[in-house]
Regions:
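Non-catalytic surface loops within mature trypsin-like serine protease
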Residues: 8, 17, 46-48, 82-84, ...
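Residue-level signal for secondary-structure boundary sites
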Residues: 12, 21, 50-52, 88, ...
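A short, acidic/glycine-rich surface segment
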Residues: 20-29, 65, 98
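Core segments of cupin and vicinal oxygen chelate
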Residues: 1-20
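Vicinal oxygen chelate
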Residues: 2-5, 24-98
C-alpha cells in the first residue's frame, strides 16, 4: 500500500489483491473487502511547469508517458501507468475551468 498526503487529505493506494480478501476471523482490524477490479484512473492537478518536470522525472526513471497533449479548451495532461496498471494523470486545473 502507498499513502500520499495531499494538502489536508490523504490519498490511499491499496494493493488490490490484499484488499479484496475478507479479514481473517481473528483479525485485529476487521476491515471489510474493498477496492475495484481492473485498472483505475487518478488525476492530480499540476501547473504547466510542474507537468514538464514530472514528465522529465518519470522518463528519467524508466516510466513511459503514454500521452502528452493539450486539451481543446486549454490545459495540458500527461498520462502514465503505475506498477499495478492504473492510469495516472497530471493535468492543469484549467481543463476543469479552475
Amino acid at each position: 500500500h502507498v499513502f500520499f498526503r495531499c494538502g489536508t487529505g490523504i490519498l490511499l493506494l491499496f494493493n488490490a489483491e490484499a484488499t479484496r480478501r475478507p479479514p481473517a476471523p481473528d483479525a485485529r482490524l476487521p476491515v471489510p473487502p474493498h477496492g475495484a477490479q481492473g485498472p483505475g484512473h487518478l488525476c492530480l492537478a499540476a501547473g504547466a511547469e510542474e507537468i514538464t518536470r514530472w514528465k522529465a522525472h518519470l522518463e528519467a526513471n524508466g516510466v513511459a508517458v503514454e500521452a502528452d497533449f493539450l486539451w481543446p479548451g486549454g490545459g495540458r495532461s500527461i498520462y502514465f501507468r503505475d506498477p499495478s496498471g492504473n492510469s495516472l494523470e497530471f493535468a492543469e486545473p484549467k481543463i476543469w475551468g479552475l
